[in-house]
């Protein structure tokens, strides 16, 4: 019975579910009702589970305690006797013993415990004095607010208040810095906006908007379209309306009455403010000069009144063509807009965010928002201009200027009189020159001369080096030839002739430091000689007179030979069949470290040569003979199913043993969250990375010791 009770409590508390299993909970209650000993044993097991370092285990154990507390007087007596410890384990009233992770489960445990303690006090507070005292202790001493949804303790509230004060202080300081930056940069931003507006006025010198509030170019076209059908004032009327009659007044169409306005609007867009001034000028001119219908038609380029004029305003907005006239203005506007987009607008947006977080800089916030709207409006205006780049004008101008500069660099020199750069073959005898040799003979003779010249120069260079074999041979020849100049020459024997031929074929190796110290075990070079310190006080206790330098010693014993051949990349692959059914993709030159010598194989990984196929079959048979039949995984599974004993069949097919989780349903506390800090720590504090850093630092220290070995600071170490 005790084993069954322990198993039930273990399964219920380690399930990791928010609600308890009703069937298992029913069995647990039935066991607890059987005797008081079983109830006491269940209480001890639950207290043990409440001390576990996992909030989900404590939450499930508390739910069991709540179920048993409301049903058993004996269980209430046991719990009230250890009520303080119970509160510390469920509510975290002791700041030195906070609730364990995970945080969400700990928060749910605290809320459930708070509601349960309040309900227990209302129902059983009068009967159990310790329960009422515990509730009073929580409410008045620990200052626990039972109406608080988050169920925070005094220490937690204090920590959150301090954290909020710290954040408010940071936001205030950030807003103060933004205020100072705004005061410093406001004039610069306004100057930049003024430059952009002036550039726009130079590019489009017409007033598009009737009121200063509307600043978008898109509204200009709509206003112009709306203005086109409006009737003109009497001062701008046609001669017929002014009282001048003609023979063609009856045939004049209605649109001819607006010829002045139509001609004024052809090919451009005119603002509404300019119309009254134009009308006043025209009326004053009409008063001074007599009006004539023919003069009116001729002045406006019209032949007669028999046709109509339709003025179409493009609906797609403006289009500014880039040319040589507005190139400088466009460059200035682009520079200012680039400064706005890359510097001013992000800075102003950051000001708005800082002032919003602080919440106390309403005036500065409004000013920053207005400034942001002006900057965005300037960028939108530039987009609505639809600037079309010039078609090759700039490139042609620059190319022309570059060609002129290049032509100025050359100085014209007159040709030399009588100079012939090439003498014909039939005139070479006339100039006293030898006839030109054939091309093949000339090339062959030139190649032979060059080869002889290189051989002679190489011999002279070798003879000039006293350490070379050629110089030694030359010295020996001088010594042998000087005592007997008149002696007859002795023919060399066959062995000497063979040696001379081998010497002639032997390659010439340049003399290096390794040949100088070849075969010597005790090298004098590569050692640092330390002199004894003559100071009275700064003197090391033990001085090594000679210190070997590993770097220099390695140079004296080794030689770097450059590979003179050509590198041929590996084109073939191993293509051996892997256990997962795929082919090996390693591109080793001769031997694969996993599958041995690389041999030609087909698409299925089988060897193409019969000898290789037979050899692999023999190796496979040897491996099968070395592995006993009773260790076959399928056979072991059948035996396990028959006997019920674990023979390790599940581990036989795997490389590693693996560790099974004890409670897989619980949240793994050792699993770290995938944050940026965790990923950086994994890379920075990796074993290989730490070893590389240590090796680099040791190498730096060794170099300092070798370089400053005579200084007392390094001599004492």
UniProtKB/Swiss-Prot annotation:
Gene symbol of the encoding locus: Uvssa
UniProt keyword Signal present: no
Pfam families linked: DUF2043 (PF09740), UVSSA_N (PF20867)
UniProtKB keywords: Chromosome, Coiled coil, DNA damage, DNA repair, Isopeptide bond, Metal-binding, Phosphoprotein, Ubl conjugation, Zinc, Zinc-finger
Listed name of the protein: UV-stimulated scaffold protein A
Post-translational modification as stated in the protein's UniProt record: Monoubiquitinated at Lys-416 in response to transcription stress; this promotes efficient transfer of TFIIH to stalled RNA polymerase II.
Residue ranges, compositional bias (Basic residues): 652-664
Organism placement in taxonomy: Eukaryota, Metazoa, Chordata, Craniata, Vertebrata
Gene Ontology cellular-component terms listed: chromosome; nucleoplasm; nucleus; site of DNA damage
Domain of life: Eukaryota
